[in-house]
């Protein structure tokens, strides 16, 4: 029946952590789409995915026009959007990152050469606040596409696995992730022999990883991460089987989707005879721009030589030439273990690292790897400047923000600049995840941190270059990182020889190697463990054993890069004089109202008097930020006087306010309810030692004056002396004499 609803179910057994049920449904919602499926997680979280395709191919395109969109509906979590118009606007960062998670295993699963427009829209319709919807959306997108009658080699399954108390747990909740050492999203497909080929990995250590490892948990080393990939396989099999069961009941037959005609053997042979020597020579040029210029010349030469014979078949010549540089480079790597720029498969390009690359900023660093150049810049501010989030996630604020910019100048081109594209958001998020596990806690370093990575030159893995530049920039800004982090991009070349697929892993890939290679595998970490990992592949899948070997190869490269970075900076520098100074004070919760005062009068007065900025948390923690240390300390002293009153001591210096003048001196308010007398004989010091007839000639009511408590009599009366710049040493000598 056309309107019949079909179901399939996958039960995930997590042992002591219980079970998760992923249920697929089709035939009830979005019935006019080519394929639609609803995925439920424990009947509590619901994602609707719909796949549609254009009727005719876009023959003028030289790429596959696949679009993935994720629509977060705030009603899913029982919220009303916080925007002015109270409706959803541009996609959140979470939605954009989920789009990329869906796209990465989906794209290589389509028939090669397909030019029909394909759109997949995943709508988050219901969400348990303790669930993460991204992996549910990955499976929903696979299921809806499998049902759509498209040339698609699915299904594939996506699962999040987290290492919690020594066990890999599938589909963990936010609550469970608080105890996780490592968190990993893995997508893969089941092969004919029953094994699972990995198609996509997105992984990270957590904020608590360092502490958990100190407490005895197993560190997420390369071997542990490889074990996590193996642990994900049984879960992926269960998910793929459920989708296959659903497709057996409801999938449309695969339609006719013609692809551009492949090049004839005659064209390939003619092209080989015409320019093979020139092409081979061009592919040995190390410099990116010189190599690309020579490849353009060879392409023009090929057209010039072949057009008389293939008149009117310019597109065919162009199509024949397009894969040649890639296939020739790959063939050289497989046979000779030599790469475009002459390096061996494990060699790293020349590295350079320096800090304090630009003036006045709070922290900066420049990292170069070959032609890839990244500038990292750190800015520190009060915690009230942390990013406020209005999303479906239970996380509402983010004190560490990592922004990645990729202007067209980085590749020597013209182009649009402005708001970040999906790629820039994704690269920034990857670099952020690599750094977060080693950041200090709010209590250890009460600052909002904005890290900006400027890609000033690009020829391979600017995202991993951003990790390296950010580590050095943060250290230069004085951020006490738990450990330095570096990153490296790995590539993979595969070729079938005598029916067997051979793989060669490449360390530190170039942009061209990323383009013609079969895998982009980015790994970041400390000397001890992996902090972030990302895998993209153009193949239907990669054996887990190949990935495990690439992980070990990446570790050797990472350690070498860390050594170079540590030569530039290995410990946190002193904070820049341009950075704000932030200190904390803890007060009783019942004293918060007194510090704020009626209509915020008290807190506003403290901020006005000292120039400090004050943020008060609900638990009584107060963050005080100022341009310099003395201003912050003055604010802290005032707050302590209100909420944590202590008896003043002789020798204590306080910035006070004149509250009354008399013929014999001025009364200065030091703390709420505590005044002291600055005698007229002492006021003359403020007038350069001249005789003072009227106190008002030197001090007025409301004027600020730095004073020191000189004496406290038996009745608690305070006698003050002024603190004069240049005379502080003399004051210290008097204090020593008095003590003797």
From Swiss-Prot:
Example GO BP: RNA processing
GO molecular function: 3'-5'-RNA exonuclease activity; magnesium ion binding; polyribonucleotide nucleotidyltransferase activity; RNA binding
Localization (cell): Cytoplasm
Catalysed reaction equations from the record: RNA(n+1) + phosphate = RNA(n) + a ribonucleoside 5'-diphosphate
Class of enzymatic activity (EC top level): transferase
Gene Ontology cellular component terms for the protein in this record: cytosol
NCBIfam families to which the protein is assigned, alphabetical: polynuc_phos (TIGR03591), pppGpp_PNP (TIGR02696), PRK11824.1 (NF008805)
Protein name: Polyribonucleotide nucleotidyltransferase
UniProt domain S1 motif: residue ranges: 651-723
Co-factor(s): Mg(2+)
InterPro entries the UniProt entry points to: ExoRNase_PH_dom1 (IPR001247), ExoRNase_PH_dom2_sf (IPR036345), GPSI/PNP (IPR014069), KH_dom (IPR004087), KH_dom_type_1 (IPR004088), KH_dom_type_1_sf (IPR036612), NA-bd_OB-fold (IPR012340), PNPase (IPR012162)
UniProt domain KH: residue ranges: 580-639
Family to which the UniProt record says this protein belongs: Belongs to the polyribonucleotide nucleotidyltransferase family.
Residues involved in Mg(2+) binding: 514, 520
Assembly and interaction partners: Homotrimer.
Protein keywords: Cytoplasm, Magnesium, Metal-binding, Nucleotidyltransferase, RNA-binding, Transferase
The UniProt record lists the keyword RNA-binding: yes
The organism's place on the tree of life at top rank: Bacteria
Assigned EC number: 2.7.7.8
Main location: cytoplasm
Keyword Manganese among record annotations: no
Database matches in Pfam families: KH_1, PNPase, RNase_PH, S1
């Amino acid at each position: 029946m056309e309107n019949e609803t079909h179901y399939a179910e996958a039960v995930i057994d997590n042992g002591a952590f219980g079970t998760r049920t992923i249920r697929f449904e089709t035939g009830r919602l979005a019935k006019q789409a080519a394929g639609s499926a609803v995925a439920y997680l424990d009947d509590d979280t619901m994602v609707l995915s719909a796949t549609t395709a254009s009727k005719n191919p876009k023959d003028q395109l030289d790429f596959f026009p696949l679009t993935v969109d994720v629509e977060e509906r705030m009603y899913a979590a029982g919220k009303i959007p916080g925007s002015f118009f109270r409706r959803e606007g541009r996609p959140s960062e979470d939605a954009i990152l989920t789009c990329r998670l869906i796209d990465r295993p989906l794209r290589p699963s389509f028939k090669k050469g397909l030019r029909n427009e394909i759109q997949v829209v995943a709508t988050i319709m219901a969400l348990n606040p303790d669930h993460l919807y991204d992996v549910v959306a990955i499976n929903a997108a696979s299921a809806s596409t499998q049902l759509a009658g498209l040339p698609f080699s699915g299904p594939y399954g996506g699962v999040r696995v987290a290492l919690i108390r020594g066990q890999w747990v599938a589909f963990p909740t936010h609550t469970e992730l608080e105890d996780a050492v490592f968190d990993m999203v893995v997508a893969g497909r089941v092969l004919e022999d029953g094994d699972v080929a990995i198609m996509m990995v997105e992984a990270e250590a957590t904020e608590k990883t360092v502490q958990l490892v100190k407490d005895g948990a197993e560190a997420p080393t390369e071997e542990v991460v490889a074990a996590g990939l193996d642990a994900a396989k049984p879960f992926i099999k269960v998910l793929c089987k459920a989708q296959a069961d659903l497709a057996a009941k409801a999938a449309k037959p695969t339609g006719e989707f013609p692809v551009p005609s492949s090049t004839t053997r005659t064209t390939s042979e003619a092209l080989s005879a015409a320019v093979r020597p020139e092409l081979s020579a061009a592919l040995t040029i190390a410099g990116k721009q010189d190599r690309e210029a020579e490849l353009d010349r060879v392409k023009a030469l090929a057209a010039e030589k072949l057009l008389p014979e293939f008149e009117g078949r310019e597109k065919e010549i162009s199509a024949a030439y397009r894969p040649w540089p890639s296939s020739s480079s790959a063939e050289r790597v497989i046979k000779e273990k030599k790469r475009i720029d002459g390096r061996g498969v494990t060699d790293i390009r020349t590295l350079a690292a320096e800090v304090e690359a630009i003036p006045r900023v709070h922290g900066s660093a420049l990292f170069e790897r070959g032609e890839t150049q990244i500038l990292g810049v750190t800015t520190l501010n009060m915690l009230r400047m942390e990013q406020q989030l209005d999303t479906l996630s239970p996380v509402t604020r983010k004190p560490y923000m990592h922004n990645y910019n990729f202007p067209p100048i980085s590749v020597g081109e013209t182009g649009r600049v402005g708001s970040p594209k999906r790629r820039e958001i994704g690269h920034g998020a990857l670099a952020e995840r690599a750094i977060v596990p080693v950041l200090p806690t709010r209590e250890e370093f009460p600052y909002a941190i904005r890290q900006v990575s400027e890609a000033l030159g690009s020829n391979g893995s600017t995202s991993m270059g951003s990790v390296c530049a950010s580590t050095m920039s943060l250290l230069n800004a004085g951020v006490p990182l738990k450990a330095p982090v570096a990153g490296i991009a790995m590539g993979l070349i595969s070729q079938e020889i005598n029916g067997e697929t051979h793989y060669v892993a490449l360390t530190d890939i170039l942009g061209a190697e990323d383009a013609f290679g079969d895998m982009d595998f980015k790994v970041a970490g400390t000397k001890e463990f992996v902090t972030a990992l990302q895998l993209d592949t153009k193949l239907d899948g990669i054996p887990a054993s190949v990935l495990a070997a690439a992980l070990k190869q990446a570790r050797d490269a990472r350690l070498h890069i860390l050594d170079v970075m540590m030569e530039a900076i290995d410990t946190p520098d002193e904070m820049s004089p341009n950075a704000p100074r932030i200190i904390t004070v803890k007060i009783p919760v019942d004293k918060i109202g007194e510090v704020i005062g009626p209509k915020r009068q008290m807190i506003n007065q403290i901020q006005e008097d000292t120039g400090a900025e004050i943020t008060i948390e609900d638990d009584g923690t107060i963050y005080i930020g100022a341009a310099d240390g003395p201003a912050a300390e003055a604010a802290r002293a005032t707050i302590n006087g209100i909420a944590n009153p202590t008896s003043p001591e002789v020798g204590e210096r306080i910035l006070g306010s004149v509250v009354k003048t008399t013929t014999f001196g001025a009364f200065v308010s030091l703390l709420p309810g505590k005044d002291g007398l600055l005698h007229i004989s002492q006021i003359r010091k403020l007038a350069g030692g001249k005789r003072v007839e009227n106190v008002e000639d030197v001090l007025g009511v409301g004027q600020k004056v730095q004073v020191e408590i000189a004496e406290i009599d038996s009745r608690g009366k305070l006698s003050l002396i002024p603190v004069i710049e240049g005379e502080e040493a003399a004051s210290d000598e008097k204090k020593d004499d008095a003590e003797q």
